[in-house]
Every structure is written in structure tokens, then in C-alpha cells.
UniProtKB/Swiss-Prot annotation:
Protein name: Lipoprotein-releasing system ATP-binding protein LolD
GO cellular component: plasma membrane
This protein's UniProt keywords: ATP-binding, Cell inner membrane, Cell membrane, Membrane, Nucleotide-binding, Translocase, Transport
Amino-acid positions noted as binding ATP in the UniProt annotation, renumbered to this chain: 42-49
Gene from which the chain derives: lolD
Organism: Shigella flexneri
Length: 233
């Protein structure tokens, strides 16, 4: 088994509005190995997106902890979490969240700029990542000049430009048609093989989940046993 990269220990998340308490996550525990491609399947409102926010250090659990590469996130300062997100984690969302006034190349370069890389390194790394997703010829185009599939490829390039250890993906093919969704999954698999990047994808798409190496199911804020998707349509 691969070395554990990320581990969740009894994660709970509760929101409170006045006297009303809502438990969104209940004692969630699992781990992701280095280079693993894993899916968490669940319907809308099951707690999947909340879980990703906790894993990425974007929110704080009510109880429990997230341990990344042996380091508990509860012991990290806000600045240290931000550095971790910039250098070790990548994020892909259902909507691409590209900056509309920037070119594809400039969007991909943004994490490198935040990480204060040298200008020459920023340009070459961003262009190389666009090449890896098959879009070097679109480097100087803005998001409005790209198709939906191309915009999502740019978002993936941006997530991977810092060579993160783990990419957290929230419904990465949710806004794409079947052909583009298949193309995006093939791209994720190729990048996993070439770079050894681990992927944790949360989705309601059983066909996407079926193509990952391991699947878990989330229902009402709880992770169930590993999901069998044999014969899923």
C-alpha cells in the first residue's frame, strides 16, 4: 500500500444558527495514499463539498483533525495553511473560476506568482503546464474565447502548475458534456501517471467514480463502506 498522504480522524462539522444545530459531517475517517485516485460519491447535500473545504484547510472542523503528510492541520497557522494550499494542494471546481481579464497563460501562472517564483520560471512552467493539457496554442486567449472543455483544462493546468502532492476536485466534470467529461478524466489519469499526483474527487457521477481506483460513499454526512460500482450505468 502507498504511504498515507492525507488522513482524516473523526471529522465532524456542525453549523449553528440561533438555537438550531445542523450536523453536516459526522465522524468521518479515511485516508488517501500517495499517487492514489479516489472518489467520494454522494448526492447534493450529503456533505461532500464541506468535506473538501476541511481537507483543504479552508474551514475548521468542529472536532477531529486532518493530517497532511504527517502534519495535523489544527496545529498550522492561517499563513502556514495558505502556504500548504499554494505548494502542496491543488483545487479543481465544477465552475472553472478563471479570471476573465487574464489570458489562459496568466491564469495558470497565478499560483506561481503567489508563490513568488522568478518571472522566467513562472512563464516557462505555466506554458509547459498548458502544453501538458493540450492548450499551448490557446495561451494568449481569454476565458471568453475558450470552449467549456478548454476552460476546465486551463483550470486543471492552474491546479497542477505547482506540482502539488494532492488535488481536491469538486464535481470537476459537472458542467461538461459527455465527450468533454471523458476527455477531462483521461487527462487526470495521464497526469496521475506522469506526475504521481494523488486525486480526491467528490462527485455524484457514478461513471466518473467508477474509473477511479477506490470509491467511498457519503450519505447524510457519514462515510459508508467502500462502494461497489460493478455494472454501474
Amino acid at each position: 500500500m502507498n504511504k498515507i498522504l492525507l488522513q482524516c480522524d473523526n471529522l465532524c462539522k456542525r453549523y449553528q444558527e440561533g438555537s438550531v444545530q445542523t450536523d453536516v459531517l459526522l465522524n468521518v475517517s479515511f485516508s488517501v495514499g500517495e499517487g492514489e485516485m479516489m472518489a467520494i460519491v454522494g448526492s447534493s447535500g450529503s456533505g461532500k463539498s464541506t468535506l473538501l473545504h476541511l481537507l483543504g484547510g479552508l474551514d475548521t472542523p468542529t472536532s477531529g483533525d486532518v493530517i497532511f503528510n504527517g502534519q495535523p492541520m489544527s496545529k498550522l497557522s492561517s499563513a502556514a495553511k495558505a502556504e500548504l494550499r499554494n505548494q502542496k494542494l491543488g483545487f479543481i471546481y465544477q465552475f472553472h473560476h478563471l479570471l476573465p481579464d487574464f489570458t489562459a497563460l496568466e491564469n495558470v501562472a497565478m499560483p506561481l506568482l503567489i508563490g513568488k517564483k522568478k518571472p522566467a520560471e513562472i512563464n516557462s512552467c505555466a506554458l509547459e503546464m498548458l502544453k501538458a493539457v493540450g492548450l499551448e496554442h490557446r495561451a494568449n486567449h481569454r476565458p471568453s474565447e475558450l470552449s467549456g472543455g478548454e476552460r476546465q483544462r486551463v483550470a486543471i493546468a492552474r491546479a497542477l502548475v505547482n506540482n502539488p502532492r494532492l488535488v481536491l476536485a469538486d464535481e470537476p466534470t459537472g458542467n461538461l458534456d459527455a465527450r468533454n467529461a471523458d476527455s477531462i478524466f483521461q487527462l487526470l489519469g495521464e497526469l496521475n501517471r506522469l506526475q504521481g499526483t494523488a486525486f480526491l474527487v467528490v462527485t455524484h457521477d457514478l461513471q466518473l467514480a467508477k474509473r477511479m481506483s477506490r470509491q467511498l460513499e457519503m450519505r447524510d454526512g457519514r462515510l459508508t463502506a467502500e462502494l461497489s460500482l460493478m455494472g454501474a450505468e
